[in-house]
């Protein structure tokens, strides 16, 4: 029998795949996902169950009425067997009455027990309810029912012949027809195995026919009702427990607040009593002081008179007054003057004789329940927030052992201890970093749950070289992308959208795995689905394995497209088996990866591939909120001579509009213009839509996140702050020499470097080229990327190259005329390329040229000293004979005596007899003299050699 997949059934009946999978599991079928296959009978069962679910349930209503009027006698059935009675029995009640059904079943069982006895009931139970674990009992019950039905059929034939009544109007025949239909239905469901027993009837004279389907449905409904009652009881118990727990928490909180209020009232009463005592003490001191002043005033004039009389009697001492007397006179005079001034002019002069004014009481402010603080708050700021005097807080801090003034900053721990002493709950204020745009991607509260809608999937196509990735992309674009402007020319911006079955799919055109890896390193997970292309004739290749690892690291589902099935050597089964070794298992083998056999060249099964993409996207349930401010990721960036920085963005959440203030990576700006993948200007971009924008002040990096801010001022502040942080981080990465890394620094000083400046057309090419050059492995030499940027080669690049002794590499760009002229003047080398492999080879050759030459020793020959001659003012001359090879004039020699090297040096002269020669061959004799060595002896061995340079590979 043929099989069907669940998503095909869902498409046929117009239901979602998720509903069909759940319904199949409910029917007891062993399925795992939308790709699981079922038999044709099971498929019909699923379709019929969906059609029954959409229609009113007539079966359950039919089973209630007949059971209430069922009688064991056959004659009663004949009396009540009219067509009108049948119609009334089939009519559907308005509502189910489970109590009435249970009473009807009880009456039916009692009647059956009286008529047939317990044996019939046991047989009926065994025949009516199939027990899966007891097949033998079911077969025996079926045989008994068949024998009874055969006898009853013979009786009815005799009755029909005698009465000449048509079997169509016979009530017994109606019951038989029902039994036959019921037996056929049971045969379809696999309940009876003997085909001869299907058309036979159960005798109505002994027991009425039982509608097993109706009874099963009724029991199922009753079980569901009981389960719902239990669930409701359990839910109510949980709600009651929650309510009691909440009530207990509220009571505990109220008790704590009450205790705190009582403590505060006691503290306030104590403070009030202290203030009253201080007020009384001050008033008593003031009254005592005023009394003493009045007493001194009364005694002041007599003292003056006595003093004046005393001085007048002394003669010469008349004009000499003591210092105390002068002060007394002056004070008295001043007091009288003030007194007269007050009485004459009515000035409000303080009178010491009046009673003191009452001290004004300070207005009492309640302490706050919570206090939100920031690190570094001063005592004065805290006092103002909690409405207390700074002196009071300083006093409390002093009692806690902290010496502080009202302008001194406090740390968080001290502030918390101070608030605990006041009985206030202290909370640190959470500082929101406006420059951190990553928080929008991590904060779940950023989205509105009621506004979330379905979005288009983002698909990345990966695979080995020459496996058809580019061909598939071209096929999809040419066949599915709508024509653009004049001539159907479209602008390629690194990402594009196609439409299939009324739904959009976004494809990312990320050439090579380097860009994908760099985006993963920065955490830019923008891909929802990966299409892995494998050639049917090549199978799994190294880059295929690399693509599998990248997709698993990204955590995205994989759809395998087996390409080139039109070739003669295609073997899709081998590809499936090889991918299974790396954890990519087909759904046909019980895995979770979809496999589609396609031919991108001949446009074969492309529709099936797109349907699979939409199916996987439906299972993944990709959602987005288009109402919030837009956030997303940079796909590509480049520098245009006329437009400036151009960035290709993929909107992931929210909607991006023209004139929105935006922060992209470490740069900022305002969206000046927005162009879609067809080269048309648009005013807004919804989630999963790729657009190209202008208006940024600098070129961002591929893989950076972007976010829209409320106003341009906030965006500018966030962008400048992010730029400062990036610069500070770059400076912190500079390694300084210490004792720990001294050896590594000295070792690194021995390594030669090749300085390069990289300029390319797009940011992705800059990153890929820089990463490829750094990975070049040449022992003793490394590449140092001095500067890398997007755009043409200008004068500043030439100046930097001259200062750092670097080579400028231009990838798909050209130098300006001024830069070329300056490079010729400053003797700066500029290399222009359009193929990355050529750049790598050229830089590798330059690195090898930086290395010092490596030499290898080559032995030329050996000679034996036969005689020595000592010549004055010249030295020792050795007569030799060559025993192996040759001895040349420009070779170096070693003097070996008793297998020990005595001397190693150059030849001073080489002669054959009396003639100077360039070399002496094998078995020839000659004379030689060695520079700076005269200790030659007979039987010394002379070894001649030269040093040859080794070519590096």
Swiss-Prot record:
Q: Where is the composition biased (Low complexity)?
A: 322-338
Main site of residence?
Answer: cytoplasm
Compositionally biased residues, Basic and acidic residues: 80-89, 98-111, 140-188, 229-248, 300-317
A Pfam family annotated for this chain is EF-G_D2
Basic residues composition-biased segments? 339-348
Region annotation (G5) maps to 599-601
Please give the name of this protein: Translation initiation factor IF-2
For this chain, one GO molecular function annotation is: GTP binding
């Amino acid at each position: 029998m043929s099989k069907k997949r669940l998503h095909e059934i869902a498409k046929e009946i117009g239901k979602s795949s998720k509903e069909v999978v759940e319904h199949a599991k409910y029917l007891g079928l062993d399925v795992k996902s939308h790709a699981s296959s079922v038999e044709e009978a099971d498929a019909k069962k699923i379709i019929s169950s969906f059609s029954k679910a959409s229609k009113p349930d007539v079966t359950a209503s039919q089973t209630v009425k007949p059971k209430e009027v069922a009688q064991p006698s056959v004659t009663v059935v004949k009396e009540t067997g009219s067509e009108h009675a049948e119609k009334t029995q089939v009519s559907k009640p308005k509502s189910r009455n489970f109590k009435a059904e249970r009473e009807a079943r009880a009456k039916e069982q009692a009647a059956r027990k009286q008529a047939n006895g317990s044996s019939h009931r046991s047989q009926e139970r065994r025949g009516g309810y199939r027990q899966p674990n007891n097949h033998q009992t079911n077969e025996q019950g079926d045989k008994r029912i068949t024998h009874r039905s055969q006898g009853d059929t013979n009786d009815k034939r005799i009755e029909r012949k005698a009465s000449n009544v048509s079997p169509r109007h016979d009530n017994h025949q109606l019951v038989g027809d029902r039994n036959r239909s019921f037996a056929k239905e049971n045969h379809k469901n696999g309940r009876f195995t003997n085909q001869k027993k299907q058309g036979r009837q159960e005798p109505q004279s002994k027991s009425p026919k039982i509608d097993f389907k109706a009874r099963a449905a009724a029991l199922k409904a009753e079980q569901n009702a009981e389960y719902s009652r239990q669930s409701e009881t359990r839910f109510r118990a949980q709600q009651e427990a929650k309510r009691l727990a909440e009530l207990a928490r509220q009571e505990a909180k109220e008790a704590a607040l009450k205790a705190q209020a009582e403590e505060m009232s006691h503290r306030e009463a104590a403070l009030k009593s202290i203030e009253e005592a201080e007020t009384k003490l001050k008033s008593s001191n003031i009254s005592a002081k005023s009394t003493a002043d009045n007493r001194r005033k009364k005694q002041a004039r007599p003292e003056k008179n006595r003093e004046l009389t005393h001085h007048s009697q002394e003669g010469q001492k008349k004009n000499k007054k003591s210092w105390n007397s002068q002060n007394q006179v002056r004070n008295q005079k001043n007091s009288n003057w003030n007194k007269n001034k007050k009485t004459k002019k009515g000035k409000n002069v303080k009178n010491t004789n009046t009673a003191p004014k009452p001290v004004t009481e300070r207005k009492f402010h309640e302490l706050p329940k919570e206090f939100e603080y920031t690190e570094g708050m001063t005592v004065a700021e805290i006092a103002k927030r909690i409405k207390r005097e700074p002196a009071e807080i300083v006093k409390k801090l002093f009692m806690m052992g902290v010496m502080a003034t009202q302008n001194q900053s406090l740390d968080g721990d001290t502030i918390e201890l101070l608030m605990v002493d006041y009985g206030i709950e202290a909370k640190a204020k959470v500082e929101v970093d406006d420059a951190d745009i990553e928080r929008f991607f991590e904060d779940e509260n950023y989205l509105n749950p009621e506004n979330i809608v379905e979005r288009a999937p983002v698909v990345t196509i990966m695979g080995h070289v020459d496996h058809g990735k580019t061909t598939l992309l071209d096929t999809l674009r040419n066949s599915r992308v709508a024509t653009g402007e004049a001539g159907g020319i479209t602008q390629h911006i690194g990402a594009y959208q196609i439409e299939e079955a009324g739904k959009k799919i976004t494809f990312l055109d990320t050439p090579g795995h380097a860009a994908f890896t760099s985006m993963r390193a920065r955490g830019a997970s923008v891909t929802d689905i990966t299409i892995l292309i494998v050639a049917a004739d090549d199978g799994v290749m190294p880059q295929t394995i690399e693509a599998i690892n990248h997709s698993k690291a990204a955590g995205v589902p994989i759809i395998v497209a087996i390409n080139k099935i039109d070739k003669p050597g295609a073997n899709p089964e081998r590809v499936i088996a090889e991918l299974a070794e790396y954890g990519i298992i087909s759904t046909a083998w019980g895995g979770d990866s979809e496999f589609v056999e396609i031919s991108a060249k001949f446009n074969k099964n492309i529709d099936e591939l797109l349907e699979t993409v939409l199916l996987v996207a439906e299972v993944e349930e990709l959602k987005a909120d288009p109402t919030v401010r837009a956030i997303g990721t940079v796909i590509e960036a480049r520098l245009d001579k006329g437009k400036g920085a151009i960035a290709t963005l993929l909107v992931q959440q929210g909607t991006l509009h023209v004139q929105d203030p935006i922060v992209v990576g470490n740069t900022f700006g305002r969206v000046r213009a927005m162009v879609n993948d067809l080269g048309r200007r648009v005013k807004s971009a919804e989630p999963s839509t790729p657009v190209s924008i202008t208006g940024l002040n600098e070129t961002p990096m591929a893989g950076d996140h972007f976010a829209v801010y409320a106003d341009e001022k906030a965006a500018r502040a966030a962008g400048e702050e992010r730029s400062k942080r990036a610069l500070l981080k770059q400076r912190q990465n500079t390694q300084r020499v210490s004792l720990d890394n001294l050896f590594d620094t000295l070792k690194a000083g021995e390594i030669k470097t090749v300085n390069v400046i990289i300029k390319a057309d797009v940011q992705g090419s800059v990153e890929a080229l820089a990463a490829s050059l750094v990975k070049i492995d040449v022992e003793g030499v490394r590449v140092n990327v001095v500067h890398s940027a997007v755009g043409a080669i200008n004068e500043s690049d030439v100046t930097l190259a001259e200062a750092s002794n670097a080579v400028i590499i231009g990838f798909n760009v050209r130098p300006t005329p001024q830069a070329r002229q300056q490079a010729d003047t400053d003797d700066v080398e500029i290399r222009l390329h359009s193929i990355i492999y050529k750049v790598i080879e050229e830089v590798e050759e330059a690195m090898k040229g930086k290395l010092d030459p490596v030499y290898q020793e080559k032995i030329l020959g050996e000679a034996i000293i036969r005689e020595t001659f000592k010549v004055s003012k010249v030295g020792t001359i050795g007569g030799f004979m060559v025993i192996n090879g040759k001895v040349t004039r420009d070779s170096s020699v070693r003097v070996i005596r008793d297998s020990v090297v005595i001397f190693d040096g150059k030849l001073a002269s080489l002669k054959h007899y009396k003639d100077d020669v360039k070399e002496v061959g094998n078995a020839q004799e000659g004379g030689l003299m060695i520079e700076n060595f005269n200790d030659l002896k007979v039987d010394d061995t002379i070894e001649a050699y030269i040093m040859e340079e080794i070519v590096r590979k």
